[in-house]
Regions:
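Enriched for short, Lys/Arg-rich terminal
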Residues: 13, 64-105
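Arg/Lys-rich, positively charged N-terminal/basic patches that mediate binding to nucleic acids
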Residues: 1-32
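Residue-level marker for the onset of beta-strands and adjacent loop->beta junctions
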Residues: 1, 59, 70-72
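A short, surface-exposed loop/turn module that caps and links secondary-structure elements
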Residues: 35-64
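Intrinsically disordered, low-complexity regions enriched in polar/acidic and amide residues
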Residues: 21-24, 39, 101
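Exposed alpha-helical structural elements
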Residues: 25, 44, 95-99
């Protein structure tokens, strides 16, 4: 089941930090995953997150763009079939998980 991808206000700011070519790649990846954003353990394309360095990220999933060095963290709002993008950031250590933890509270 396809979900509607929605960027949070913070994620809209995040994506502007990338150049136009990178923005197209990020948008394309989000659109691809939005076709089936469920966690992989439910047959979807999302990589589920759990506890990362003491941060409870249960219920969140990630998309990894290896060549760009970018992680996209999102949560599903199943009742509305919405895939809400919380963070779009470089894969600098686990910084993206720190940001996701703060924004998800």
């Amino acid at each position: 089941m396809s979900y509607k991808a929605k960027l949070s206000d913070d994620a809209k700011k995040d994506i502007k930090e990338f150049n136009p070519a990178q923005q197209r790649q990020i948008t394309s990846a989000i659109q691809k995953v939005s076709i089936n954003p469920l966690p992989q353990n439910e047959g979807g394309l999302g990589k589920p997150l759990g506890n990362k360095q003491g941060k409870n990220l249960t219920g969140l999933c990630k998309i990894v763009l290896m060549k760009l060095g970018v992680r996209i963290v999102y949560k599903l709002i199943r009742t509305e079939t919405v895939m809400e993008i919380i963070v779009i950031a470089a894969r600098a250590d686990d910084e993206v998980y720190d940001i996701a933890n703060k924004r998800n509270q």
